[in-house]
């Protein structure tokens, strides 16, 4: 399983590659996702990668400040930016967790 995580424990992305024989495609998708995240998340400069598994599962968990509804709305918009940046792929899920609210959004990923 490929796990991307930052210094902030509330933010993580998990990815299982679709085909174990082509791990470079999984890494490419992960790097594209990393670039997308970097565009809106300057506070998360370091991401670690490890690889193992058979299919893609991406999960983004963002826990905003309790007093910041505007931050939650901003995160929703930024997840949309991630989705638009990965257009030449096939549909999967991305989940954005905001406090107790879990939102599932279609995400395009490379196979």
From Swiss-Prot:
GO terms for cellular component: mitochondrion. The keyword Mitochondrion applies. It is found in: Mitochondrion. Keywords: Mitochondrion. A stretch of 270 kb of the mitochondrial genome is duplicated within the centromere of chromosome 2 resulting in the duplication of the gene. The expression of the duplicated gene is not demonstrated. This is Uncharacterized mitochondrial protein AtMg01180.
